[in-house]
Amino acid sequence: MTPRQRLTVLATGLGIFMVFVDVNIVNVALPSIQKVFHTGEQGLQWAVAGYSLGMAAVLMSCALLGDRYGRRRSFVFGVTLFVVSSIVCVLPVSLAVFTVARVIQGLGAAFISVLSLALLSHSFPNPRMKARAISNWMAIGMVGAASAPALGGLMVDGLGWRSVFLVNVPLGAIVWLLTLVGVDESQDPEPTQLDWVGQLTLIPAVALIAYTIIEAPRFDRQSAGFVAALLLAAGVLLWLFVRHEHRAAFPLVDLKLFAEPLYRSVLIVYFVVMSCFFGTLMVITQHFQNVRDLSPLHAGLMMLPVPAGFGVASLLAGRAVNKWGPQLPVLTCLAAMFIGLAIFAISMDHAHPVALVGLTIFGAGAGGCATPLLHLGMTKVDDGRAGMAAGMLNLQRSLGGIFGVAFLGTIVAAWLGAALPNTMADEIPDPIARAIVVDVIVDSANPHAHAAFIGPGHRITAAQEDEIVLAADAVFVSGIKLALGGAAVLLTGAFVLGWTRFPRTPAS
């Protein structure tokens, strides 16, 4: 690599590091944020979900703006938006202001995510060098994602909850400076007109889909009509979008990309990998904090094998693609994710050292998958459509992360709701008291959350506490194992698709 190429990798890598860290780091600060804004669980969840929703809604628009007005200029704009909104997040004005700031932060994250990959692709036209560059970029970013719980726990314990947002200010300044000094500007050589109709149909469609996925765990049978209406509206908007894109002279998304079976397969497998990665991180963090009752810092430290494995595998994946082609690394790493989940599920309730080995293998599998998939996705398009291709890949990551958290979380919640009432029948004979405790535990995803209902004036006595916790812990462990099994099913489908679609030949 030339010195300028190294600066490009560093600048874009640190940018995506900020984005991935903020996906998860705020979870550690939620108890403190809850006290400041005096809000309940639903308000907190939307404060978190606003980031992902804002990011998912505008990814493709960011790609088009970057291709037209300059990818470096748009990247710098995204970094600036991200830093300014991070500052607003620490102002104790109201929960509404905090949530809006998180949405705007997601908008900035969308610019950073899409344009960092597009800038990287432009700076490395050679496929072999591009594979190495993407592997380094992905390693930096995903280490941020997986290390966020530990980093957040350390910062919240030592500096307070505002530090998880204020850290973006100096980091953003470094990214801003490195980009202006070391990254070349690039854009579509034949800039197109802005596809306003495409944006006005795609953005609300993606927002509705993301909203439905985020809210899915809270919907009940009475909400079926509302859910159907949301999905119908999203479907109509997508139909209008596709119809318009077929006719548009300058489309937001070139639908010819999807005519290539390989590109479609890359998007699907990448969606599955990101779903399983982010969904599993959420479930495992929940296990360490809520079931094992570890502190945020201790739980974060237990998660460190995931970024360690991810980072090492990401760095090696580029060389593996150049030597063996994309199929073997992807299939091997999908199998590693499956095996890592199996090891963790078997040992999670009694053998922590073995469970940590499973997390390391899982992280390595995810890191080794991401680089070949991004390499395949970016090499299938010409440089003029690099922003568009990067936007589609980042959209899969964003929606995949939302879907994975909702999918695995729904499995755990459904299992708890079905199994806890029968399991606690002996500990809490009174059906009314039992229903109250079950609702509290399921809503908070915490077997210890029933403590507020124990004591004078309540139907549950303090003597029942140990039995309730033991029973709830056992059901939680079973639910988490079931959720990990759901992730394994998704990985199996991705493995079959990769086996049949991905090329075996190395990059030339």
Swiss-Prot record:
**Primary subcellular site in the record, as a coarse category:** membrane
Subcellular localization is given as: Cell inner membrane
Cite the PROSITE patterns for this sequence.
MFS
Q: Where are the transmembrane segments?
A: 9-29, 46-66, 75-95, 104-124, 136-156, 163-183, 194-214, 222-242, 265-285, 297-317, 328-348, 354-374, 399-419, 479-499
- Keyword set includes Transmembrane helix: yes
Q: Which molecular function terms from Gene Ontology are attached?
A: transmembrane transporter activity
Q: Which domain of life is it from?
A: Bacteria
Q: State the annotated membrane topology for this chain.
A: Multi-pass membrane protein
Q: Which InterPro entries match?
A: MFS, MFS_dom, MFS_trans_sf
Q: Does the keyword Cell membrane apply?
A: yes
Q: How is its activity regulated?
A: Efflux activity is inhibited by carbonyl cyanide m-chlorophenylhydrazone (CCCP) and verapamil.
Q: Briefly describe its induction.
A: Induced in the presence of ethambutol or isoniazid.
Q: Write the record's keywords in alphabetical order, separated by commas.
A: Antibiotic resistance, Cell inner membrane, Cell membrane, Membrane, Transmembrane, Transmembrane helix, Transport
Per the UniProt entry, what are the Gene Ontology biological process annotations, in alphabetical order?
response to antibiotic
What are the annotated GO cellular component locations?
Answer: membrane; plasma membrane
State the similarity comment. Belongs to the major facilitator superfamily.
What functional role does this protein have? Involved in resistance to ethambutol and isoniazid.
According to UniProt, the name of this protein is: Drug efflux pump JefA
The gene designation is jefA
